[in-house]
Amino acid sequence: MTFSPQRPEFETGKQPDPETEHAGDFFEETSSSAPRAASNGSSGPNYTLITTFLAALTAGIFAFWAGWTRKWISDDGLIVLRTVRNLLAGNGPVFNAGERVEANTSTLWQYCIYLVALVTDYRLEDIALWLALLFTTAASIIGVLGTAHLHRKRIAVLLPAGVIGYFSLSPARDFATSGLEWGLSLMWISIQWLLLVLWATSGKTSGKKASGAKTSNPIVNAGAITYALAFWSGLSWLVRPELAMYGGLTGVLLLLTAPRWRVVLGILVAALPLPAAYQIFRMGYYGLMVPHTAVAKSASDAVWGTGWEYVEDFTGPYNLWLGLALLLAAGALTVWKTDKHLAIPKGRLGLRTPGMAIALLVICALVHFLYVIRVGGDFMHGRMLLLPLFAILLPVSVIPVNVVDRGWQDLVALVLVFSTWVWSTVVFVQGHQWENTGQHVVDERDFWIDFTNRDEDHPPLYAEDFLTVDSMNDYAEVMRDQTLVNPTGQQLNILASSDPTTYSWITTPRVEGVEAGDLANLSPTVFHVNLGMTSMNAPLNVRVTDLIGLATPLAARQPRIEGGRIGHDKLMDLEWQVAESATPLAYTPGWLDTQKTYEARQALRHPELVHLFQTYREPMSYHRFVDNIKYALTTGRTLEISDNPEDLLKEFNPTPAEIQDGLETIAWPGEIKLDEPRGEPLYSSQ
């Protein structure tokens, strides 16, 4: 994407409007020793345009190939697809039909899959894989075009650098697919970067001559790009919550540089309605201000030490600091070649410059890095650091090397780029050597290949590929022959044999009579630590819950385990889960504490828990919607319950657990719609 730098002057005698005047910036004006492509009288090839196209093509091909060779789907990716199944069936954007729980972090990602599923018969796993891969590919191309636009006035060869370094990293290739929203997030960041660059180069600049103003990029309408950037910034919150920082700071910059109140109003109108409308919907429908995953993975505590260990786990295997040093040094040389005599931007209106666009993106990325470190990182190798890394590498996604009037900086930049390519090649070939030793941070792709008892060349791609996990032994058979045939309270995972280690599944009957009460409205329930593989291998009329709290509010509200695995540091006891199901107390599994199970069932009627159940189970109505908004703004932000039911029983007058009739309702009857089986796989991993 290149634009001819036409420079129409104002009419004679007219001075530029001080409210729209901006000073030039170092990427707008190149040094006198580096002639502008547009002002060169040569009829030779446009090296900048040609190499922009080649760099974008190279980046796209490399990103696609890198992601394709590591294609797979994670258990967390399957969680998203369960919500999509409920959307397709007509049960709403929920994980379990009848329970309004937002189990996915990215709002837009689930709807992207849903929209494609509406018009195709492809399996959801295939749709998720292809969308993620195409979004990732688009992100690499758009990122290159955005950076190349900064150098459009040079006569230079643009060499792909940062984008090559990024996709040489094993986790970057792993999360190019995986079923998660990383491809969508990368594309959002890239488009945000491109729009920032176009915005920064489309205002009016004051040149060295005082006679008039000139338009730095007349092909892009300055007003339209401002509102487009505002709208795109508003979407940040719906892509991933932490991207709201990028969108929010961009919005602040747009407001600061707005020349008139009418523009300020236009920016607000473009940016706020969609995210604000969804936020009202989220609070009224789910009873929360944030996705439910944010409640389960509470980030309220600062664990800097653990976070830095997470950084070292990511940087160490790839000598990432070396790669970053090479890329940032090449970027610094690009800045070094700028004309030191350019006017310094003055006033708030002078902030509309490419330099400010770069500074904004870098600041956002650095703050993002700090946030990840503060919350302790993640349990997946490199995952949470990929987005800020991609963002900070965008300004150096390509490095310009001047074709004419080359200086020593060009030679050094060329050496640095080639060194980056060598480093990237070594890192790409070497990969990430990981062994499952039970550590807190795991290579998620290799973990699931190992956990599903598959080999490296056949990673899991579909829900049924996870049935080879040891703990999923006979899961589908018990589901088909018992859970869906007989009145069932729960389907439970058991250790059938310790030598050799063998797992199996059993079922419990359903409550009846006075012990049932409204618990009889609960569907047959599967309880397991991994939500994706259990839920995607079960029909929608089977309720699937977890002990971490991703889809289980009762678990999400329990206290964190000190020193636990980041992101998985809440583990609800099985006694709570049996109590909060349609399982008769007499059939409490023998390995559980029967007294604790009894007390947990009593504690379900604690006023705070009753209110919690109402927010996501009571049928939707105007009253429920309004009450949920109030709850989201108050109790929903802070509620934490003890994992010991005895503590809760001290706070109210409990009734005997054997009698559930006539109590405050915590489960409501409702119709559950089933989805239709989808088409054959596009390819086979077998």
UniProtKB/Swiss-Prot annotation:
Membrane topology term? Multi-pass membrane protein
Alphabetically ordered keywords of this record: Cell wall biogenesis/degradation, Glycosyltransferase, Membrane, Transferase, Transmembrane, Transmembrane helix
Q: Give the GO cellular component terms, alphabetically.
A: membrane
Report the top EC class in one word.
Answer: transferase
Q: Where is the composition biased (Polar residues)?
A: 29-42
- Would I find Glycosyltransferase among this entry's keywords? yes
The effect of disrupting this gene, in the record's words, is: Cells lacking this gene show an absence of the cell wall-bound corynomycolic acids and of beta-(1->2) Araf linkage.
Which EC number(s) does the record attach to this protein?
Answer: 2.4.2.-
User: Where does the record place Basic and acidic residues bias?
Assistant: 8-25
The protein in question is named Terminal beta-(1->2)-arabinofuranosyltransferase
Q: Which organism is it from?
A: Corynebacterium glutamicum (strain ATCC 13032 / DSM 20300 / JCM 1318 / BCRC 11384 / CCUG 27702 / LMG 3730 / NBRC 12168 / NCIMB 10025 / NRRL B-2784 / 534)
Gene name tied to this protein: aftB
